[in-house]
Amino acid sequence: MFAPGIKEILVEFHETSSITATFLVSIYILGFAFGPLLVAPLSEMYGRAPLYNIGNILFTIFTVGTALSTNTGMLLAFRFLMGLAGSVPITIGSGSIADCMKMENRGKAMSAWALGPLLGPCIGPIAGGYLIKAAGWRWVFWLIVIIGGCLIPFAFFCLRETYAPVLLERKTARLRKETGNPNLRSKLASDKSAAETFKAAIYRPMKLLIFEPIITLMSLYVAITYGILYMLFTTFTFVYSGHYGFGVDTIGLAYLPTGIGMLIGVGVSGFLSDKIVKDRTAKGLIHRPEVRLLPYFTIPCGLLLCAGLFIYGWTVQEHVHWIVPMVGVLIFCAAIMGIMMSVQSYLLEAFLAHAASVTAALAVLRSLLGALLPLGALDLYESKLQFGWGNSLLGFIALLLVPIPFIFYVYGEKLRKKSRFNKAN
């Protein structure tokens, strides 16, 4: 939301580094890389609702610190802490959906849930641009504080626990108290102590990421495309102000095609994903998670993603009318959402018993590249490659990853049967 004000911040804090300019935006995503490692195990021990409420409070407090920042270091630190607290719904949101939704409705539910964290960076800069011009960049964060302060009590009273092991343990504890029988145990209770459970859970996302080839390669695909997305996000301000003369108030409109593209990708992905599951159920076929990786959808999405990068890069370099690179961005964003939603739905069902840990593993790699790849974006575009070959290079890298969903569509079930993590399903 404050991306349109980057140039204003650089002037106020006497900064000239292009790396600092992009890092001010992307460091928030770096918080998403580390937060899930703590949030995922805690959610599997204490449930989802307490973490949502604590995360909301901490996020609002850290946003106050961001608004009061007096130098670049302070601003970067509080932006990172905002990302840590903001990672709570990103990490356990899909787990809550898995807790509540039937299998045939999860695709649409996942799509609806994804709209928040993905449309935020698209719609936010539009409102932020006009707010920054009218009141300065700090009011972006004061507005977030006001909204957060209003939502905290609403969430506290309205959110209910959904995680089955925690709910069953609470019921068991109540029955122990009512019956006086200390030997009653939850069917889902673990024999491990809280410390042992936490230790096992905190290592699980990294074990999944390192030792599960399905999660490793799928996460890598999503992470690279997500990193490219944030390379575009963090450079839009410089591209559209420098090449097309957009002002502080109108620069946010450059992010609008990303939102439109994501809406298209999410809508199509959710519809097709649930439709194929319902069709298979109607035919009496056994559901397998691999059907979420529809080859006739994920492969075209992968190719369109590359095409969008080529269109954006070369039309910016040749100074074609600004609407044309925006069309390229729209195509790219529609395609990336198709891929991300298919992959996330697949991984969630393939490792359902460890949904929070799988989401954490996916978030760690995705957020690391989302935060770090943009640091070299301006240098890439200012090199001999410029926008044309620079974005073409990114497109060719993405092209190499296109077959990954198809590989696991064919061989995923065999690999899952060999997985020790999958036995809990």
Predicted regions and their residues:
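A six-helix transmembrane bundle that forms the core substrate pathway of small-molecule transporters
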Residues: 1-425
